[in-house]
Amino acid sequence: MNYARLALASLAGVVAYFVYGFAMFAALPAMKTEFLKYPNVYRPEKEMMKVMPFGMIAILVGIIVAAVLYAKINPAGGTIASGASLGTLIGLFVVCVFVIHNYINLNIGITLTVYQAVAYFLQWVIVCAAIGLVYKPPITTP
């Protein structure tokens, strides 16, 4: 495993995660409006900012895990497409164990659930595509 490229791929994944996340909320203000319909479920924005460092660390760890999985699945290196393929699997996993799980356990509506499912699925496809773009195996000399 190429640890320097793994670190760079993780960084690329983090950048992709946040760029997409900010762009998504800018392009889909209706999604933010949906979140605001559930003030008893979600923290107000000011309160979220107080715990945001923990969330950012968790996101970083999750993306590092995705990069390690990518490196183990593609030891000879890969492409954006192979990264997007892994992202599709991770995106489906996230939708099933996070988004649908929240729909069942939290008092939120189907509209917010659909927004989250589409947004988070695409986010992981993009993150892993960025990982696939950057990660390359170590150069070996015969």
PLM segments and residue spans:
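Juxtamembrane/disordered regions of integral membrane proteins
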Residues: 1-142
